[in-house]
Amino acid sequence: MKIFFAFILAFFASFHYSQAQALDETHVEPYCHIHTIPPSISSEAISSKATSSEATSSEATVLTESAASRVDSILASSPLLYKSSLGLMVYDLTDNKTIISYGEKNTLRPASTMKLVTAIAAIDRLGGSYLFRTSLRYTGEIKDNVLNGDVYCIGGFDPRFNSDDLTAFVEGIRSLGIDTIRGCLVADKMMKNEDRLGWGWCWDDDNPVLSPLLISRKDEFMQHFVSELVDAGIVFIGNIIEGDTPIDAYEIVDRTHTIDQILMKMMKDSDNLYAEALFYQLASSSGNRPATAQDARNIIKRLIRKIGLNPSDYIFADGSGLSLYNYVTAELEVEMLKYAYQNSNIYLHLYPSLPIAGIDGTLKRRMKTPFTTDNVRAKTGTLTGVQSLAGYCTTPNNHTLCFAIINNGILKDSQARSLQDKICEALCSP
């Protein structure tokens, strides 16, 4: 028995940017299953020596084909198939094979599923024990409770740094017996360059602050620091400046947060500031000071090449997916998810950070059905005209799938989300 299902759609798009590279004309490929439905097997043909593993494999194939057939029907009935650009790919990580693909090589804007690329590249490069660090140092001499020297606040682009951390900074100064500072308070922002907006961001959007020295998400660190010093009774006589910290500066205190703490907020809540902070940690790992977005892009491109794809086929503009210049494919996102799954040092940190269908994050109110709730774990993406979803789910026969669904040119977000939810339901149902 065979299922014949074919659509030939052609979408041509020419993308022109004032600063971006031109993309080739994109063709939407006809829908294609990469699967074969097994023919009916008579009882006479069944060998008495058939093993249980063969039976299990047969059952798994039937379940896979059933899911693919359901996705066929969903796509056939969706107006988005011919009214928008779609990229879809589903890969069986247990059987190591692609089971569904449609337009998987179409170059599309990913929106916040770009955060998956950032997260996987960062964990791969930095490691699961990596710490976001903001440091306090000083130079000069302490005599009679007076510091005749400078205090340096070294920014590490930690989006979680808050008033409690700042209080710890002030307590660190008090612990040295200092009640007066005669010198400068220096804001060391040398971790990254001075870019305030990401490449391809709209200036009038509610964009995250790209400063390596933040307090409660705002670029007001030094003002708050001086206020805390005054409240603690520490006299400051000097100027507030920006500069680089000398290598011989003395340590006062460090405040750190783990990469897991960053990932949880970044992925569950789709927090753009956290994503850009991680993007610049990646950039900083290049050793360049100040680091740039291009440093991060170069590291991501090396990983793309490592997993067997051509990085020149994509554009990586930022870490969050806010940029209108990001262009990836469903195939790329699936390959990244595969790479993460196959490397436990990445997967153990990525998987817990993903929103859980019907439970938390951006999927809390979605897919509240018996087969998808607490099963689908995926990153959502939303921009004007863009809806995307990429992540993992488990089939009734305990196969782990990874998938990516990217939809561009949509007029109604609810319509695209409904399509995503139905596809996930089809993958998770018996």
What are these regions (language model features)?
Residues 131-192, 201-208, 215:
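Active-site-adjacent, His/Asp/Glu-enriched structural segments that form or flank metal-binding
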Residues 23-44, 58-107, 171-176, 429:
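Beta-lactamase-like hydrolase cores
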Residues 215-353:
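A small/polar active-site loop signature that marks catalytic segments
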Residues 96, 110-128, 185, 224-228, ...:
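Active-site SXXK
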Residues 87-91, 100-101, 150-154, 184-188, ...:
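Soluble periplasmic/extracytoplasmic beta-strand elements of cell-envelope proteins
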Residues 83-85, 103-105, 111-114, 129-131, ...:
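Extracytoplasmic
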Residues 1-26:
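Bacterial Sec-dependent N-terminal signal peptides
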Residues 315-316, 322-430:
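C-terminal soluble interaction/assembly domains
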